[in-house]
Regions:
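Active-site phosphate-binding strand-loop segment of PLP-dependent enzymes
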Residues: 140, 144-206
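Helix C-cap/helix->beta junction micro-motif
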Residues: 29, 135, 195-196
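Short acidic capping loops at alpha-helix termini that bridge into adjacent secondary structure
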Residues: 88-94, 114-117, 164
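Conserved PLP-anchoring active-site segment centered on the Schiff-base-forming lysine
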Residues: 108-132
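A short helix-loop-beta submotif of the ANL/AMP-binding
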Residues: 134-140
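N-terminal small-domain helix-loop-helix segment of the aminotransferase-like
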Residues: 2-3, 8-99, 106
Length: 206
C-alpha cells in the first residue's frame, strides 16, 4: 500500500525542520552545547511548580473548560492591564492554549482563507511557514538584513503587500536573532498596516 496517496497534498510540500535535525544530532553527542532550539536555560520557578503539584493533589486532572480555567483567564486579564494598561475581557477575549505553536496554528486556521497571503519576516520561527500552508494560505517572506539589525522595515513591508495580503506576523523580540523593533520602526509599520487593513499576529514568546 502506498500511504503517500492518502496524505494531504499540502503536507507533502512541507520539508522536515532542519533545526530539529540538528537538535536530534546534538542530543546524541557528548560534550556538545546545543544552540539549535531557543528555550530558557533555567528551571521553572518553585512557586509555579508547587502550584502545579497542589492542583494535582486537588484532583484537577480532568478536561479544562474550552477557554481555560476562569482563575487563569482572570489572572491573565489582570496581568495585561497592570503591565500594559490594556483591558481584555477574560470570558471573551482570552484563550489559553497548550503552548505558542497551538495558538499560532489556531490563529492562522481561524483567520486565513484559501490563497490569502501571510507576510513573514525572516529569519523566523520554523513553524510560521508550514502552519500558513496547512491553513490554506501562502507564505510571503521578507528577508530582513544584518545592516538593519534584522528589524522589519516599513518600506519592505509595503513592497511585499498585494491584494491577497491578509496577515503580518510580527515575531519580536525575534526568534532566532533576538532582534528588537525600535519604537520608530513600529510606528511606521503601524501606518502601513492601517493603510492596507492588515491583521497582525504578534508573537512575543521571547
Amino acid at each position: 500500500m502506498n500511504y503517500d496517496n492518502y496524505i494531504n497534498n499540502s503536507i507533502k510540500t512541507i520539508p522536515p525542520s532542519g533545526i530539529r535535525r540538528f537538535f536530534d544530532i546534538a542530543n546524541e553527542m557528548d560534550d556538545v552545547i546545543s544552540l539549535s532550539i531557543g528555550e530558557p536555560d533555567f528551571q521553572t520557578p518553585w512557586h509555579i511548580r508547587d502550584e502545579g503539584i497542589r492542583s494535582l493533589e486537588k484532583g484537577k486532572t480532568w478536561y479544562s473548560p474550552n477557554r481555560g480555567f476562569s482563575e487563569l483567564l482572570n489572572g491573565i486579564s489582570d496581568y495585561f492591564e497592570r503591565k500594559f494598561g490594556v483591558k481584555y475581557e477574560a470570558d471573551k477575549q482570552i484563550l489559553v492554549t497548550v503552548g505558542g505553536s497551538e495558538a499560532i496554528d489556531l490563529a492562522f486556521r481561524t483567520l486565513v482563507n484559501e490563497g490569502e497571503e501571510v507576510i513573514i519576516p525572516e529569519p523566523s520561527f520554523v513553524c510560521y511557514e508550514p502552519l500558513t500552508v496547512m491553513a490554506g494560505g501562502k507564505p510571503v517572506i521578507i528577508k530582513t538584513k544584518n545592516e538593519d539589525s534584522f528589524r522589519l522595515k516599513a518600506k519592505d513591508l509595503e513592497a511585499a503587500i498585494t491584494p491577497k495580503s491578509k496577515l503580518l506576523v510580527l515575531p519580536y523580540p525575534n526568534n532566532p536573532t533576538g532582534a528588537i523593533m525600535a519604537k520608530e520602526d513600529l510606528e511606521e509599520i503601524a501606518e502601513v498596516i492601517k493603510k492596507h487593513d492588515l491583521l497582525v499576529l504578534s508573537d512575543e514568546i521571547y
